A protein has these predicted regions:
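Conserved histidines in hydrophobic membrane contexts and catalytic metal-binding motifs
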Residues: 1-158
Length: 158
C-alpha cells in the first residue's frame, strides 16, 4: 500500500488536489477587523471567487479529529458547492477575512485517504513520525539493501 499511495501522489498534482483550478483571480478585500460576515455573504463570496455554484452554508465552531478543515482556525463557514460536473465540493471560508482557506473535493478526499495510508496515521493524518512508519521505513530500507546485496552477489557466481 505504501508504494501504491506513493505512485498515486506522483501522478496527481497537489495544486489540483487543493482545488486551485476552481479559484478565480480576484482582489482580496478584507472586512474591518473583528467583523464577521453573514452566511449569505459567504455564499456570494464563494460565487464571486470560484467557478463553483454555492448551495448552502454551515458554520463550523468545533474542531473534529481528521476533518477536512483540520489545522485551520475556527470558526469557519463551510460552503457546500457543485462544479460543472455536479460533483459536491466543500469550500471553507474564514468569516472574518473572507479568505477561502481550503477547497475539498473527492479528489482531495482520495488524496487524504492515500496520505493516511502512506504515513500510516489513519486518524489525524498529520503524524509522520509515528512508530508504524518508522518500523516499516527501516524494513523497506533493509529489504532494498538485501536485494542489492543479493543482486551483486549472484552476479559474481556466474
Amino acid at each position: 500500500m505504501w508504494t501504491i499511495s506513493g505512485i498515486y501522489f506522483s501522478f496527481n498534482k497537489i495544486e489540483d488536489v487543493r482545488g486551485s483550478q476552481y479559484l478565480r483571480t480576484t482582489e482580496v478585500i478584507e472586512t474591518p477587523k473583528g467583523n464577521k460576515i453573514e452566511p449569505q455573504k459567504a455564499l456570494l463570496n464563494v460565487a464571486d471567487k470560484t467557478f463553483l455554484k454555492p448551495i448552502s452554508v454551515v458554520e463550523i465552531t468545533e474542531d473534529k479529529a481528521g476533518s477536512e478543515y483540520r489545522g485551520r482556525s475556527l470558526p469557519l463557514y463551510m460552503i457546500e458547492t457543485i462544479n460543472e460536473e455536479n460533483e459536491g465540493i466543500n469550500v471553507y471560508l474564514d468569516p472574518f477575512s473572507e479568505e477561502i482557506v481550503a477547497i475539498r473535493s473527492n479528489q482531495w478526499r482520495i488524496w487524504d485517504f492515500m496520505w493516511g495510508i502512506h504515513i500510516m496515521d489513519w486518524n489525524e493524518r498529520d503524524n509522520i513520525g509515528n512508530v508504524f512508519l518508522k518500523i516499516f521505513s527501516i524494513l523497506a530500507l533493509l529489504s532494498a539493501l538485501s536485494g542489492i546485496y543479493l543482486f551483486f552477489s549472484s552476479n559474481k557466481k556466474k
